[in-house]
UniProtKB/Swiss-Prot annotation:
UniProt protein name: Small ribosomal subunit protein uS5
SUPFAM superfamilies: dsRNA-binding domain-like, Ribosomal protein S5 domain 2-like
InterPro entries reported for this sequence: Ribosomal_Su5_D2-typ_SF, Ribosomal_uS5, Ribosomal_uS5_bac-type, Ribosomal_uS5_C, Ribosomal_uS5_N, Ribosomal_uS5_N_CS, Ribsml_uS5_D2-typ_fold_subgr
Keywords noted in UniProt: Ribonucleoprotein, Ribosomal protein, RNA-binding, rRNA-binding
Function, in words: With S4 and S12 plays an important role in translational accuracy.
Family: Belongs to the universal ribosomal protein uS5 family.
Domain notes: The N-terminal domain interacts with the head of the 30S subunit; the C-terminal domain interacts with the body and contacts protein S4. The interaction surface between S4 and S5 is involved in control of translational fidelity.
Gene designation: rpsE
Amino acid sequence: MAKTSAKNIRPGELNLKEKLVHINRTAKVVKGGKRFGFNAIVVVGDKEGHVGYGLGKANEVQDAIAKGIEDGKKNVIKVPIVKGTIPHQIVAKFGSAKVMMKPATPGTGLIAGGAVRAVLEMAGIHDILTKSLGSSNPHNVVKAAIKGLQSISDAYDVGERRSKSLKEVFES
């Protein structure tokens, strides 16, 4: 598995956009009633192969979203995109959320639902087939999608692992 480290990507140099995936209102019961808080899942990306996600928690919605964006910028990964799609099929699991992603031919479009769609849009993938199985919890679905995108190996990674040139990889 080719793991792209978030350490060597500088989010300040990227033109990152953000997309809100989910807002959840939480309630803490105290002596005087209920105290409400909010958490927000935000996906950030430049639509050119960089994507990250963040979770923000605060007493106000706007503060939670801002914290989520900041957290997302710290977790940016690089996704290898080949002709608007991914190089190979992936099945990733996080908790009981399972996400299956298949490469598609140009013109197919982004066939994904909910949280997975937000991740793929921000990554800049235009043609892909996906299916979300198991839990539909947005937290775990986003994490499974990111985990899957992080595990993608392109031809350069395979050549590096095998100590072969790009030409030798395609011949074997």
